[in-house]
Amino acid sequence: MLILTRRIGETLIIGDEITVTLLGIKGNQIRVGINAPKKISVHREEIYKKIQLEKKNLL
């Protein structure tokens, strides 16, 4: 796992098409903005796991 330190307003670039920007910090939560092409799905982990479980149950 790559671990990076960023300040509010700074951005990470993943590949050629994805950017992740640190928008703010409030208490123990951070806000991130993610720009990615529509062909790339972006989900919170708990939502992704729920989607995968639903797909598995349909088989």
Swiss-Prot record:
A Pfam family the protein falls into: CsrA
UniProt-listed GO biological process terms: mRNA catabolic process; negative regulation of translational initiation; positive regulation of translational initiation; regulation of carbohydrate metabolic process
Name by which UniProt lists this protein: Translational regulator CsrA
GO molecular function: mRNA 5'-UTR binding
Keyword terms, alphabetized: Activator, Cytoplasm, Repressor, RNA-binding, Translation regulation
Any one GO cellular component localisation term in the record: cytosol
InterPro entries for this protein: CsrA, CsrA_sf
Cited function: A key translational regulator that binds mRNA to regulate translation initiation and/or mRNA stability. Mediates global changes in gene expression, shifting from rapid growth to stress survival by linking envelope stress, the stringent response and the catabolite repression systems. Usually binds in the 5'-UTR; binding at or near the Shine-Dalgarno sequence prevents ribosome-binding, repressing translation, binding elsewhere in the 5'-UTR can activate translation and/or stabilize the mRNA. Its function is antagonized by small RNA(s).
Subunit structure and binding partners: Homodimer; the beta-strands of each monomer intercalate to form a hydrophobic core, while the alpha-helices form wings that extend away from the core.
Localization per Swiss-Prot or TrEMBL: Cytoplasm
Keyword Nuclease found: no
Family per similarity comment: Belongs to the CsrA/RsmA family.
Domain of life (superkingdom): Bacteria
